[in-house]
Amino acid sequence: TALPVEVSLEAYNPLIPMDVKNSAIPTGIFNIKVKNRSDSKVTIDLLATQQNAVGFTGYDTIVGPNRRSAKGYGQNKNAIISKAGETSIQMTGPAGSMQLSAYADDVSSTASWEDVTSLHRDFSENGKLTGEKTASSPDSGKTVDGALATGFSLQPGEEKTITFVLSWYFPKGSFGAFDRNWHDWAFLKGGSMYENWWANANDVDQYIKENFSYLESTTKLYHKTMYSSNIPRYALDRISSNLCVLKSPTVFWTKAGYFGIWESTSNNEVWGGNCKHVGHYAQGHARAFPEIGRILRKQDLHSITREGLLPARDGGNVDAMDGHFGSILGVYREHLLSDNDEFLYTCWPRTKKAIDYAINRFDADKDGMLTGDHHNTLDCNASGTSPWIGTLYMAALKACEQMAIIVGDQKAAESYQAIWSVGVKNQNEQLWNEKLGHYVEKSEFLEIKGKRMKVMTDATNIDMLLGQWWANQLNLGQLYPVDRTKQSLAKIHKNNKFTDVEGSGYKAAFRDFLGTGDTGWFMNTYPGEIPKNTILYHNEVMSGFEYAAASTMLQYGMLEEGMDMIERISERYDGRFRGKGEVHMANNSCVFGTGSPFGEDECGDFYTRAMSSWSALLALQGFIYDGPKQTIGFKPTWQPEDHASFFTTSKAWGLFTQTQSQTAQTAEIAIKFGTSQLENILLAAPENKTASNISVKLNGVEQAIESSKQDGNTISIHLKSTIEVKAGVTLAVSFGLIHN
């Protein structure tokens, strides 16, 4: 309270959905805002210091006096450069470059300082720094630290923001997490994508300076638009924060264009290869950046084997049928998030080969029931049909039917539809357990060729309806009957919920992600004894799986259950550190602990599967999109009478709002960034209401409607011609409501 000023820090890396390059800048931007809250004029001095860390790999420890010694250090050089409105420390070394800049006019500097005491003494005298303008490593294995300082005066009530920018450029850096076991991943060499755009850290810095207004204003516009949603804050936090995975060491992008995703970031063992049975849960990356989704699908298909298997990991030959089907569904998602059919025509031959492989190997009699030994994301092998992988199979078949129709492969479309038709019937009849009130696994063999199978039997499995989760996101329709689907979801919420209270005696079979008092949902629970050969992770709690289950509940309007799950997850990632002694992560997991709001964990931090959280947004807004058909739709399950939510299309994002009264309904699609071509609009009227006098306006100008119809509560509007909705433009739909 004695400090006469109020100081706040805003730190970010530019994040602009649809703009991949400007969301992949190697930089950190720090805005320090100071406000004079006193009655007198005050003088402020700010100091920023940075070690020249070029050469530090992350594997070793920085040691020695003033912590300037590390294995990769040596030949590090600092140089002060000044120009109008900016002073920088250029930091170079054999491994690349860094740059710390102050975007201000009155900046003092030093290329090197001896120790913290001397730096503080120099700065405290008059708020300015003295020292050499160049410096270099005194010895092999050592580096130097530089600093910048700037000062200004504020009148009472006045405030000012000073921006510091730290940029880096490491063309020879290692990719991925702190893991030496995957250094032979075939695509690791060849530099970083940003080498195609900039030459060094100074080049990066100058790009930021020249484009600062766009980068900052558009990043903030994205944040403002996302949080203009009236969805609860805890849900928006979890939906949006998991995009941090794209900003973490979990992800890399090579100069040649290969987009690599580790399962996570860890200081020990972590798995690479763009793991399909983990990655297919992720939704946020493809919705915010459709270009990334298309790159990943093309990579998946590039790795297809001669027989048609999509390997669990790029460059391998191990199957994982959940990931196999998930990748096929991803192809259809990426098609829907395109502007035309070109992507699909390119991908269809190998996509068809992949679904045909699965049919021939696991469903040779084409009855929709899977047979034989198959691996999955639970790191085990199973045999037979579970509702989990069974629904994924059905959803993949339906997606392939739709894709075949688009490319004109009618014979394939009819074949997939025939298998789907008998498959959903057989699965519904054979997997439903009336006594338990949910679907169960139909195990086939306990052992195949000496390999012990893992079973779920009659477990309430959190992924029980994962294929339906996918199907609803892609508007593929219902798989199992709605009443049984909702009954099964209710059982997941009730049976698998667990709170780790003091004295509960909870002991996870492998890893414990729950702190004392935390609540989560187990992977499996059983009505009786736990089978001896059950899955290893049966009583673990992992958010990536929970989001998928919660979002499926939300898709069916089960708001109490679905939002309960998301709120409990948000409480676990509330910023309170849960470390060893409270949780048990196992050696190959996030041994640092858990609780970070910006890095959810499983087998490591910033876990890829957690990007499934974006599906909650899609479920709450009832989003429907088909870019090539120029179709957009919203059927909110969250407050349809007063709804607001962020949305993305193939090239744009914005805010959707909807209001309903007893006699009228209005919906607005406000584009904030990019452009969308639209010809068809889908909306939902309240139950037992019929729409009348439909009007469509683009920024107040009436648009001609070719036709409109209502099927149940779904209103379909077909415009007479395609309209282009640009940033700053709002498309408004209004109609009367008549009680049936």
What are these regions (language model features)?
Residues 29-31, 649-684:
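Carbohydrate-binding surface patches
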Residues 367-370:
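Acidic, glycine-anchored loop motifs typical of Ca2+
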Residues 43-51, 672-690:
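Surface-exposed beta-strand/loop patches in extracellular or lumenal glycoproteins
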Residues 266-311, 324, 345, 349, ...:
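Active-site core of glycosidic bond-cleaving carbohydrate-active enzymes
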Residues 2-24, 647-659:
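Low-complexity, acidic Ser/Thr/Pro/Gly-rich terminal tails and inter-domain linkers that flank the onset
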Residues 699-720:
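Extracellular/luminal ectodomains and secreted, surface-exposed scaffolds of diverse proteins
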Residues 8, 13-27, 31-275, 404, ...:
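Acidic/polar, glycine-enriched structural segments that form the non-catalytic walls/loops
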